Amino acid sequence: MKPSVILYTSNTGFTAQYAALLSEQTGLPCFSLKAAGHIQPGTPILYLGWLMAGNVQVYKEAAKKYTVCAVCGVGMGATGSQIADVRKTNALPGEMPVFVLQGGFDRKRLHGIYKLMMTVMKNTVGKSLARKPDRTPDEDTMLDLLENGGSRVSPENLSSVLDWYFGLSVSE
């Protein structure tokens, strides 16, 4: 089934940026889940949510109201990584397309428990990665994000999502 709208939940803005880029590329309207009250229940959607420990935030709420055609999780990990983990953690059906997009990290945009959790992550994972002598390029990127923050949002990261979307026929 082809989605007719993009809905998303964003915490620090990186997921919203990807949703806007997808909207530009596909021509689909795009709304935050909070602003989607006018979207009819059962509408086929492409859902984007930020990732926390493999969990696509607010996915279950979206899935209760809408027909989710595909899920994009946006996190700090490399684009295309963690797909099996995201599928398992969120109990996504095997036939549902799942995408993971690298977003970014901005400590200033975090609040409350999330700020505390990411401070702990920086102090544990960041220090562990910094000491690791044979880091992979993905680990170098993760370390850079943890230490310096920044955005890795890029239209190029959407290639798999766009290939999936434009490969669908209207009847699918």
Please provide the spans of the model-predicted regions.
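Loop/helix-junction capping segments adjacent to catalytic residues or to phosphate/diphosphate-binding pockets
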Residues: 13-16, 80, 107, 155
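N-terminal beta1-alpha1-beta2 submodule of the flavodoxin-like/Rossmannoid cofactor-binding fold
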Residues: 1-65, 163-172
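Charged/polar, solvent-exposed surface patches and flexible loops
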Residues: 24, 61, 84-88, 115, ...
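Glycine-rich phosphate/pyrophosphate-binding loop and the adjoining helix
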Residues: 120-172
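Helix-loop-strand module that forms the ligand-binding subsite of alpha/beta enzymes
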Residues: 34-113
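Solvent-exposed, non-transmembrane amphipathic alpha-helical segments
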Residues: 24, 35-38, 42, 65-66, ...
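Short, solvent-exposed beta-strand-terminating loops
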Residues: 103-129
